[in-house]
C-alpha cells in the first residue's frame, strides 16, 4: 500500500469533522464505544469525494492507495482509494476504527478467529454514506471493491499514524470455514 502524507489544517470540509472526532476521543470511552461515537460523527458530517483533489482520487491498479489527511495523538484520518477488483488480506487492526464510504461500494467480509481456522460471520456491502465502527478484538475482516468504479473511503483510526502509516496489526492465513 502506498501512503502519502497530505496533512493540511485548511483542507476544506475537514475542520468541522476533526472537531467532532476530537470531542468524542476526549470523552474517555472504551475503544468500542469510541469507535461507535466517531462513526456517529462521520454519519452526521460525512464529506464527499470532493474532499480530495482529482489527483488524490486516482487509484493504482497495482496497489491500494492511502492518503494520510490528518494525524494527532488520539486519532488519524486517512482516505483509501480502491480500484475495481482490489481487496485486502484478511486482517485486524492496531486500534479502533470508524470509516465511511465516499464513492463506490466496498464489500466487507467479517470473520471470527476460532484458533485453527476462521469462521465467516457476516458480509456487508458498504454503499456511499454508509458508516461503520469497530475495535479490537473482533475486528477481523477483508475489504473488496467488487464494483466497476473506483471506491473511496474515509477512515478514522484511534492511533497517531504520522510516523507509521501501518494500521494492520495481524494478517490471517488460516482456513475459512
Feature locations, PLM:
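Glycine- and acidic-residue-biased ligand/ion/polar-headgroup-sensing regions
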Residues: 95-112
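N-terminal leader/capping segments at the start of a protein or of a new domain
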Residues: 1-47
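A short, structured loop/turn motif at beta-sheet edges
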Residues: 126, 146-149
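Domain-scale activation on soluble regions of proteins
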Residues: 156, 163-170, 175-177
Amino acid at each position: 500500500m502506498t501512503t502519502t502524507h497530505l496533512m493540511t489544517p485548511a483542507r476544506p470540509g475537514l475542520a468541522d469533522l476533526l472537531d467532532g472526532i476530537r470531542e468524542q476521543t476526549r470523552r474517555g470511552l472504551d475503544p468500542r464505544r469510541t469507535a461507535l461515537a466517531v462513526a456517529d460523527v462521520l454519519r452526521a458530517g460525512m464529506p464527499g469525494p470532493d474532499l480530495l483533489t482529482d489527483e488524490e482520487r486516482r487509484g493504482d491498479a497495482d496497489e491500494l492507495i492511502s492518503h494520510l489527511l490528518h494525524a494527532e495523538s488520539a486519532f488519524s484520518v486517512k482516505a483509501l482509494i480502491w480500484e475495481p477488483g482490489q481487496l485486502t488480506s484478511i486482517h485486524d487492526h492496531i486500534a479502533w476504527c470508524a470509516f465511511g464510504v465516499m464513492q463506490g461500494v466496498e464489500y466487507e467480509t467479517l470473520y471470527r478467529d476460532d484458533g485453527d481456522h476462521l469462521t465467516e460471520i457476516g458480509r456487508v456491502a458498504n454503499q456511499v454514506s454508509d458508516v461503520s465502527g469497530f475495535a479490537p478484538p473482533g475486528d477481523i475482516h477483508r475489504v473488496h471493491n467488487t464494483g466497476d468504479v473506483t471506491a473511496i473511503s474515509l477512515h478514522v483510526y484511534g492511533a497517531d499514524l504520522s510516523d507509521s502509516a501501518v494500521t494492520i496489526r495481524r494478517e490471517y492465513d488460516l482456513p475459512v470455514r
